[in-house]
Amino acid sequence: KKYVFIIDEINRANLSKVFGEVMMLMEHDKRGENWSVPLTYSENDEERFYVPENVYIIGLMNTADRSLAVVDYALRRRFSFIDIEPGFDTPQFRNFLLNKKAEPSFVESLCQKMNKLNQEISKEATILGKGFRIGHSYFCSGLEDGTSPDTQWLKEIVMTDIAPLLEEYFFDDPYKQQIWADKLLGDS
């Protein structure tokens, strides 16, 4: 049986201090009892710790958060890194909204607008860039009670989530903030 250990926001801590000697045991070729280490605070000298071969460690991190330290190289080499792109072009996201009773034209318009906004964010390489693009997860909640994705639902997301984010992103250009909020809410 396989097990997954997920660490969200893995870059929020000093990972060398959190993991200590266990960091070595995370490597795929250092798994199992042969690589076990004694437990520092154990009363029993025979107690040892190892990471089993059937445990997969997944660390999630938000690279757009500037207040966080970069992951140190000692940890970085123990993980494979995969970028997760915004999913506006995926059939899964579009089908999710369609299954929630969104109109196909509404879904198409939303995806086009968000892709254009993300292109704009990516072009702002000096202060923003690719890592700051807005993901599809903003549009996956608020539908649990049977609400259908429509213009009122979109307005709420834009006004409470996206517009404040744009204020941060384009802090030096209030005009650009407003233009993009209007574009997301408009018919064009």
Regions found by a protein language model. Give the residues of each.
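C-terminal regulatory/interaction module of P-loop NTP-utilizing enzymes
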Residues: 1-188
